[in-house]
């Protein structure tokens, strides 16, 4: 039986070949999360970036075990804000609030 790649696998392969686009991907991931609140999609996207960077390397930089990081970013993960902040900082970014645009009716 042929095993087909998942969307995560395809995304990971793409960004491995195009690392210059990871910043836009990360920004868009958080932007979409701000709109729809879908944490499993955000965690999936962070998993992709973690695998590109290297889960063991990222876990060490964040101060977590490899298994702890994988669990936090799993589809059933419920990471604390300080974990997400540490992950984002280890990727070279920071969380920063941005004022919402007011809709004109």
Predicted segments with their positions:
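The DNA-recognition helices of helix-turn-helix-type DNA-binding domains
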Residues: 76-77
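Short, charged recognition helix plus adjacent turn
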Residues: 52, 96-105
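DNA major-groove recognition helix of helix-turn-helix/homeodomain DNA-binding modules
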Residues: 80-98
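N-terminal flexible/basic segments that precede or flank functional cores
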Residues: 1-44
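Short alpha-helical DNA-recognition segment
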Residues: 48-70
């Amino acid at each position: 039986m042929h095993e087909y790649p998942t969307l995560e696998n395809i995304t990971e392969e793409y960004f491995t070949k195009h690392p210059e686009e990871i910043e836009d991907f990360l920004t868009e991931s958080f932007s979409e999360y701000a709109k729809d609140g879908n944490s499993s999609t955000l965690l999936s996207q962070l998993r992709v970036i973690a695998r590109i960077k290297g889960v063991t390397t990222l876990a060490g930089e964040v101060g977590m075990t490899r298994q702890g990081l994988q669990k936090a970013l799993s589809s059933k993960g419920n990471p604390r804000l300080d974990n997400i902040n540490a992950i984002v900082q280890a990727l070279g970014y920071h969380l920063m609030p941005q004022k919402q645009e007011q809709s004109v009716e």
